Amino acid sequence: MSSGNAKIGYPAPNFKATAVMPDGQFKDISLSEYKGKYVVFFFYPLDFTFVCPTEIIAFSDRADEFKKLNCQVIGASVDSHFCHLAWINTPKKQGGLGPMNIPLISDPKRTIAQDYGVLKADEGISFRGLFIIDDKGILRQITINDLPVGRSVDEIIRLVQAFQFTDKHGEVCPAGWKPGSDTIKPDVNKSKEYFSKQK
């Protein structure tokens, strides 16, 4: 796995790449154009594979939930944008994606995967890296799965909600936090309010 330039608490590496957009058109997009929004940027190994369509469709199906959080989801792999389009145009029952609600970018030179530290150099593909980038372009969360295991969209939504809550309120979110749950005031004395309720 490449070391990359993606570091928590620092600006996420910018990229410019050709994407297949939800309307089926090709468009050059860059990370910087999403400043002011949260971004969930995820890599997957290859088009026309097995775990990948389950993840991509799961993110696409819930694009509106992310939109309500002022969050854009973007997928990426090393395949060409033509390959992405062919996969989108393949019916789901034949292992295709069907219509998409999120852009899929093409990284054929592997530079974006390299920058984000997810390149599996011996195979020239990317691991299942996922990056949560805040509305100021700062990288807030990184997870990288090995190839055989997909990711949970529920958990990604929860993390976006938690980071947005801490941004707004300055309190911190305990393990398993969900909207409406108790949070912790990051202060030795004030935190006791939370801990005193624990069994």
UniProtKB/Swiss-Prot annotation:
GO terms for molecular function: identical protein binding; peroxidase activity; thioredoxin peroxidase activity. It catalyses: a hydroperoxide + [thioredoxin]-dithiol = an alcohol + [thioredoxin]-disulfide + H2O. Disruption phenotype: Mice embryos loss approximately 50% of Islet1/Islet2+ and HB9+ motor neurons, whereas dorsal-ventral patterning events and the numbers of Olig2+ progenitors are normal. Toward the end of the cell death phase they have equivalent numbers of motor neurons as wild type embryos. One of its GO terms (cellular component) is mitochondrion. GO terms for biological process: canonical NF-kappaB signal transduction; erythrocyte homeostasis; fibroblast proliferation; hydrogen peroxide catabolic process; natural killer cell activation; natural killer cell mediated cytotoxicity; regulation of non-canonical NF-kappaB signal transduction; regulation of stress-activated MAPK cascade. Residues 6-165 form the Thioredoxin domain. Found in various tissues; high concentration in liver. It comes from the Eukaryota. The active site is a conserved redox-active cysteine residue, the peroxidatic cysteine (C(P)), which makes the nucleophilic attack on the peroxide substrate. The peroxide oxidizes the C(P)-SH to cysteine sulfenic acid (C(P)-SOH), which then reacts with another cysteine residue, the resolving cysteine (C(R)), to form a disulfide bridge. The disulfide is subsequently reduced by an appropriate electron donor to complete the catalytic cycle. In this typical 2-Cys peroxiredoxin, C(R) is provided by the other dimeric subunit to form an intersubunit disulfide. This is Peroxiredoxin-1.
